[in-house]
């Protein structure tokens, strides 16, 4: 039978030939020990077959022969940063609902773009509906089960390991929603991982513990006034381990003028209660708010990191954006508000990043709201990179957790640790004694793993933590995801660093804190890890009596 010439083939057949050719070149490069620029190979090969479009990465990954998957897929992985910290993050959104403080302040925050009453009517509070997470949620009609399944499949297709999943529950103040809806939402997140259909939250958590895809934590976005004792207890039941608290400003006048609906005192109280319950606390902060100015902005971040009443474990930096339909948009249009210039904003972010202590992680430095929706504010989509470049010019460094992580260092600078040692940093925060333990390569400033230990204050309200108890608020070994039961000698997870950090934490709790018991706020899927080293479940915590 006559073989078809290139001109006789359909575009789909030509695309199949292109994908096969790309994979052949990748295999040859691997066998010769050469590095290869995938984008150049895709462009060149597509042109060779007369195609204007390049093959999709998802299709290339799907077509890799089984015997080469182990070596080629990690090289093809799209956006390796997504799992460089050792965890696949799955962001989900709850249904649109009104902001809880409307009932007593009469309005939402002046800068807030979203919500059911906004110009973006099908969006959740503080989102426009055009962010990637929002669009995935809208496609799934805000169904938590579908959002989770779709995102996990998407990450798998892009070559990421999804053995460990951390959920981020976004979409406004989740804890202001009715209890029945909250239970339904969290139950479905756990069920989407375990495959079990649960009748209640306790059953969902029980099955999630034994799931092959481990839920190593849930992060919930909330406000300081929805972070009180009953809210914290509910979140512990869900398997939540980290809180993202909307602070925005440490100035009382700014909180009042922007219609936040809570005081700065409420921020300090929520941090104290949350840390005494074992939660990791991430703060959302907004530089460039009305009536602040550059000097006051720098002062507030100095205060935020140095004052023991604040000192968060993590930071999401969201420079103020002017978006159509907000109160701030009207102020901007009438000339009563003006955003910082691009150069001033880069300078400010650079100086803020230089203030961040080594125990704090900067998760984000800008919102992912599409630029066409922004009337004034951030003009660059790569603000972090521009701030780092400015820091280099100024001769200052960012030493936050994320910048020093081994996985991130490997991706950006191809640097691997050489001389690893235990580093200890002690500080006082929110009424308790904090110890930040880490394994680092001090010469190259690379962080391999960390542990946050707290001697709870006397104000702790959880009965499991009363009377001389120390709590491990976080244990995390960085580097690419390694399944919980396996070892990969080239990756840093499961090389024993976690065990060494736990042993040192137990020693400090026993000998220095004088504690008779140590507790761990553990993600639902990692409880069995602690059972193996002598811990048992008490309420939402894994606990161990210290001899």
Curated annotation (Swiss-Prot):
BP-aspect Gene Ontology terms: central nervous system development; neuron migration; positive regulation of cell migration; regulation of transcription by RNA polymerase II; tRNA wobble base 5-methoxycarbonylmethyl-2-thiouridinylation; tRNA wobble uridine modification
Modification Phosphotyrosine, positions: 202, 251
Family per record: Belongs to the ELP3 family.
Major site of localization recorded for this protein: cytoplasm
Biochemical pathway: tRNA modification; 5-methoxycarbonylmethyl-2-thiouridine-tRNA biosynthesis
InterPro entries xref list: Acyl_CoA_acyltransferase, ELP3, ELP3-like, ELP3-like_N, Elp3/MiaA/NifB-like_rSAM, GNAT_dom, Radical_SAM_C, rSAM
Annotated keywords: 4Fe-4S, Acyltransferase, Cytoplasm, Iron, Iron-sulfur, Metal-binding, Methylation, Neurogenesis, Nucleus, Phosphoprotein, RNA-binding, S-adenosyl-L-methionine, Transferase, tRNA processing, tRNA-binding
Name recorded for this polypeptide: Elongator complex protein 3
Residue positions where N6-methyllysine is found in the record: 229
Annotated compartments: Cytoplasm; Nucleus
Lineage: Eukaryota, Metazoa, Chordata, Craniata, Vertebrata
Reaction it catalyzes: uridine(34) in tRNA + acetyl-CoA + S-adenosyl-L-methionine + H2O = 5-(carboxymethyl)uridine(34) in tRNA + 5'-deoxyadenosine + L-methionine + CoA + 2 H(+)
Summary of subunit composition and partner proteins: Component of the elongator complex which consists of ELP1, ELP2, ELP3, ELP4, ELP5 and ELP6. ELP1, ELP2 and ELP3 form the elongator core complex. Interacts with alpha-tubulin.
Superkingdom classification of source: Eukaryota
Organism, as annotated: Bos taurus
Catalytic class of the enzyme: transferase
Essential cofactor(s): [4Fe-4S] cluster
Any GO CC annotation of this UniProt entry: nucleus
Cited PANTHER family: ELONGATOR COMPLEX PROTEIN 3, HISTONE ACETYLTRANSFERASE-RELATED
């Amino acid at each position: 039978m006559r073989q078809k010439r290139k001109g006789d083939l359909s575009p789909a057949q030509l695309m199949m030939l292109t994908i096969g050719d790309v994979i052949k070149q990748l295999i040859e490069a691997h066998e010769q020990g050469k590095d290869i620029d995938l984008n150049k190979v895709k462009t060149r090969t597509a042109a060779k077959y007369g195609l204007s479009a390049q093959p999709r990465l998802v299709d290339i990954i799907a077509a890799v022969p089984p015997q080469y998957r182990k070596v080629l897929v990690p090289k093809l992985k799209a956006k390796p940063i997504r799992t460089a910290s050792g965890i696949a993050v799955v962001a989900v959104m709850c249904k649109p609902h009104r902001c809880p403080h409307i009932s007593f302040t009469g309005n939402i925050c002046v800068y807030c773009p979203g919500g059911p009453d906004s110009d973006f009517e099908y969006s959740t509070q503080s989102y426009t509906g055009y962010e990637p997470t929002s669009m995935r949620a809208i496609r799934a009609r805000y169904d938590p089960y579908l959002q989770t399944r779709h995102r996990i499949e998407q990450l798998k297709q892009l070559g990421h390991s999804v053995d460990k999943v951390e959920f981020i529950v976004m979409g406004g103040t989740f804890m202001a929603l009715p209890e029945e809806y909250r239970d339904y939402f969290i139950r479905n997140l756990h069920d989407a991982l375990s495959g079990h259909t649960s009748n209640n939250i306790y059953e969902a958590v029980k099955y999630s513990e034994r799931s092959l895809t481990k839920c190593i934590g849930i992060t919930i976005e909330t406000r300081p006034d929805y972070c009180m004792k009953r809210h914290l207890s509910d979140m512990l039941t869900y398997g939540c381990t980290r809180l993202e608290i909307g602070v925005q400003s440490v100035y009382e006048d700014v909180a009042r003028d922007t219609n936040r609906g809570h005081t700065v005192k409420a921020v300090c109280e929520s941090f104290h209660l949350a840390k005494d319950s074992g939660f990791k606390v991430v703060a959302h902060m907004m530089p460039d708010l009305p009536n602040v100015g550059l000097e006051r902005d720098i002062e507030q971040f100095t205060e935020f990191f140095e004052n023991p009443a604040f000192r968060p474990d993590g930071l999401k930096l969201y420079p103020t954006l002017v978006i159509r339909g907000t109160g701030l948009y009207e102020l901007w249009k009438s000339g009563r508000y003006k955003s910082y210039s691009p150069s001033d904003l880069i300078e400010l972010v650079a100086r803020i990043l230089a203030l961040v202590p080594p125990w704090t992680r900067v998760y984000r430095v800008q919102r992912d709201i599409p630029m066409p929706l922004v009337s004034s504010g951030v003009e660059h989509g790569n603000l972090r990179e521009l701030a780092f470049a400015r820091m280099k010019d100024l001769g200052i460094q960012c030493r936050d957790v994320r910048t020093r992580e081994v996985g991130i260092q490997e991706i950006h600078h191809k640097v691997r640790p050489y001389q690893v040692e235990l580093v200890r940093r002690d500080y006082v925060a929110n009424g308790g004694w904090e110890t930040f333990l880490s394994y680092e390569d001090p010469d190259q400033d690379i962080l391999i793993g960390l542990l946050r230990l707290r001697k709870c204050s006397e104000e702790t309200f959880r009965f499991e933590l009363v009377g001389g108890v120390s709590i491990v608020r976080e244990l995390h070994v960085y580097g690419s995801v390694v399944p919980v039961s396996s070892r990969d000698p080239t990756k840093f997870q499961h090389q024993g660093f976690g065990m060494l950090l736990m042993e040192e934490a137990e020693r400090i709790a026993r000998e220095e804190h004088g504690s008779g018991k140590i507790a761990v706020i553990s993600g639902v899927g990692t409880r069995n890890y602690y059972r193996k080293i002598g811990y048992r479940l008490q309420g939402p915590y894994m606990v161990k009596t210290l001899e």
